[in-house]
């Protein structure tokens, strides 16, 4: 206890501390609350912290610092500012490759993000163009299917269903038209009523044969030696009679099929 009161055996330190005013020297010591221990800083106390500037106090503080360091009561002094700066610079130089790798990784991540955003923008643009073309195709299809140009707008499913039904109706109509045409062609190719014996047998002279044919055929409507009608006229008359029985829609489809047959 006596050694502690004697300031670790440093002569003149107690007298110098008593001679220094308390108000001026209080700024050099850290603030301590009641019941707390006061610890000295781990580095020498600069001269500027002491406003009293007593030579004895300064010398006593230096001796106290040296004695405490030798006794191991306080930790070793920190390196000087130049040493600290050199160590920090060496640490920065050692960590510089990692910093470079991190910066490269950061730049590569930013580049990948920009490229991915550009790819997403191009994909969205292609999708918008595709949807636009699909809508234009359905709009053109609605104008060709029955009841497609009505005030009520058909949905895509209804438009496709109407188009399928319309195509099937056209196929049935074309099949019926082909059957009628085949039947008409078969009727025209069958042999007609054979001519009379008088016209079939050869006579002595052409003049007598013509007179006998003229006498036996009272009217030109009979099938004698009269000149037969052309197959085209008979086909056109029968086709006109068949066309008269068709509905307007069937007539339109028939005209469409005849137009397709021309190609």
Curated annotation (Swiss-Prot):
Gene Ontology CC: one annotated term: cytoplasm
Residue ranges, annotated region (Disordered): 104-126, 194-248
Organism domain of life: Eukaryota
Tissue-by-tissue expression: Expressed in follicular T-helper (Tfh) cells.
Residues of the bHLH domain: 118-170
UniProt xrefs under InterPro entries: bHLH_dom (IPR011598), HLH_DNA-bd_sf (IPR036638), MASH1/Ascl1a-like (IPR015660)
Keywords, comma-separated and alphabetical: Developmental protein, Differentiation, DNA-binding, Neurogenesis, Nucleus
Subcellular location: Nucleus
Cross-referenced Pfam families: HLH
Keyword NADP: no
Function: Transcription factor. Binds to E-box motifs 5'-CANNTG-3' in the regulatory elements of target genes, probably as a heterodimer with another basic helix-loop-helix (bHLH) protein such as the transcription factor TCF3. May bind both open and closed chromatin, acting as a pioneer transcription factor to allow other factors to bind and activate lineage-specific genes. Required during post-implantation development for the generation of some differentiated trophoblast cell types.
Oligomer and partners: Efficient DNA binding requires dimerization with another basic helix-loop-helix (bHLH) protein. Forms heterodimers with bHLH transcription factor TCF3. May not heterodimerise with bHLH protein HAND1.
Misc. comment: The ASCL2 locus is imprinted in mice. Maternal inherited gene is expressed, while the paternal inherited gene is imprinted, hence silenced. However, the paternal gene is expressed in some trophoblast cells in early postimplantation embryonic stages and almost completely extinguished by 8.5 days post coitum (dpc).
Protein name per its UniProtKB record: Achaete-scute homolog 2
Gene source species: Mus musculus
Gene: Ascl2
């Amino acid at each position: 206890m006596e050694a502690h009161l004697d300031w670790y055996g440093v002569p003149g330190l107690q007298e110098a501390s008593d001679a220094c005013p308390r108000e001026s020297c209080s700024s050099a010591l850290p603030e301590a609350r009641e019941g707390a221990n006061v610890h000295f800083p781990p580095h020498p106390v600069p001269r500027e912290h002491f406003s009293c500037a007593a030579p004895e106090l300064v010398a006593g503080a230096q001796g106290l610092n040296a004695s405490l360091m030798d006794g191991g009561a306080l930790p070793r002094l920190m390196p000087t500012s130049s040493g600290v700066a050199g160590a920090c610079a060496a640490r920065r130089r050692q960590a510089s490759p990692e910093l470079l790798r991190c910066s490269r990784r950061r730049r590569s991540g930013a580049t990948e993000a920009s490229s991915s955003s550009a790819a997403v923008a191009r994909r969205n643009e292609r999708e918008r163009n595709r949807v636009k073309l699909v809508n234009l195709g359905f709009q053109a299809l609605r104008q060709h299917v029955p009841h497609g140009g009505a005030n009520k707008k058909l949905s895509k499913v209804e438009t496709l269903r109407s188009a399928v039904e319309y195509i099937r109706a056209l196929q049935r109509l074309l099949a019926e038209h082909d059957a009628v045409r085949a039947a008409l062609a078969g009727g025209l190719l069958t042999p007609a009523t054979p001519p009379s014996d008088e016209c079939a047998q050869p006579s002595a002279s052409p003049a007598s044969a013509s007179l006998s044919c003229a006498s036996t055929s009272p009217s030109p409507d009979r099938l004698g030696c009269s000149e037969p009608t052309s197959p085209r006229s008979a086909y056109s008359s029968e086709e006109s009679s068949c066309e008269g029985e068709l509905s307007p829609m069937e007539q339109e489809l028939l005209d469409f099929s005849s137009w397709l047959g021309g190609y």
